[in-house]
Curated annotation (Swiss-Prot):
Keywords: Cytoplasm, DNA-binding, Repeat, Transcription, Transcription regulation
UniProt feature coiled coil, ranges: none
Family recorded in the similarity comment: Belongs to the MraZ family.
Quaternary assembly: Forms oligomers.
Major localization class: cytoplasm
Compartment(s) where it occurs, according to its Swiss-Prot or TrEMBL record: Cytoplasm, Nucleoid
A cellular-component GO term for this protein: cytoplasm
The keyword Nuclease appears for this protein: no
Source organism of the structure: Koribacter versatilis (strain Ellin345)
Protein name per its UniProtKB record: Transcriptional regulator MraZ
């Protein structure tokens, strides 16, 4: 499982050097070094190891093909999405369209979201956390869900 925040930088060519802890996890757990890089909202890049993305796709494929939410998710995830290989130096290129939309450049936060990684503009993330903090109501919601 991926967890934690590992701040880093995106280089001028849009390449992210996968933080060492995450790279080790990928090498240990997954057969290949291929990712599906996408977004569901244009504010972040989601880096799914291909095996994880394929599990997610299988669940989507099981939904009725005319389900409007399924169609919406496929539209946005395919619009931003590309299959990307991690190079020999442990770098992954974030697609240009997604980099522009999410303003992913310079300083970024690379966070573990259990099955995948999220890359966010560090300043935007900090502002979002400060403007919408985790509250007691959020804790209660999780408690009601058994967490």
């Amino acid at each position: 499982m991926f967890r934690g925040n590992h701040p880093t930088r995106i280089d001028d060519k849009g390449r992210l050097k996968v933080p060492a802890d995450f790279k080790r996890e990928i090498e240990d757990k997954f057969q290949n070094q291929t990712f599906y890089v996408t977004s569901f909202n244009g504010k972040e890049a989601r880096l799914y190891p291909m095996e994880e993305w394929e599990r997610f796709e299988a669940k989507l494929a099981a939904l009725p093909s005319l389900n409007p939410t399924r169609q919406k998710l496929l539209n946005v995830s395919n619009y931003y999405g590309q299959v990307v290989e991690m190079d020999g130096q442990g770098r992954v290129t974030i697609p240009g369209l997604l980099r522009e939309a999410a303003e992913i450049k310079g300083e970024v936060a690379v966070m573990g979201f259990l099955q995948y990684l999220v890359v966010r503009n560090a300043e935007h993330l900090k502002n979002e956390i400060e403007s919408a903090p985790f509250t007691a109501e959020d804790e209660k919601t999780l408690s009601d869900l058994g967490i």
